[in-house]
Amino acid sequence: MPKVKTHSGAKKRFALTAKGKIKRKHAFKNHMLDKKQTKQKRRLTHTALVHKSDKSRIEKLLRI
């Protein structure tokens, strides 16, 4: 039986923390940034954690 592969899109978008939580980046910080407030852009810069309701789905994609 062949090895199960990690989802290519998921491995580019998510990262694990030392405690096993899953980090993600915020959306809406790619283009048309002149229309967005400085406060909003600063808030979107920082990484966030994946919500617990989505965690199991992401773990399946990452094969954790």
Curated annotation (Swiss-Prot):
InterPro entries in UniProt: Ribosomal_bL35 (IPR001706), Ribosomal_bL35-like (IPR021137), Ribosomal_bL35_CS (IPR018265), Ribosomal_bL35_sf (IPR037229)
Record's keyword annotation contains Ribonucleoprotein: yes
UniProt GO MF annotations: structural constituent of ribosome
Keyword RNA-binding assigned: no
Source species, domain of life: Bacteria
Pfam families (UniProt xref): Ribosomal_L35p (PF01632)
Keywords annotated in UniProt: Ribonucleoprotein, Ribosomal protein
Coiled-coil annotated residue ranges, if any: none
Biological-process GO terms, alphabetical: translation
GO cellular component, one term: cytosolic large ribosomal subunit
Family designation: Belongs to the bacterial ribosomal protein bL35 family.
Entry-linked NCBIfam families: rpmI_bact
Protein name per Swiss-Prot or TrEMBL: Large ribosomal subunit protein bL35
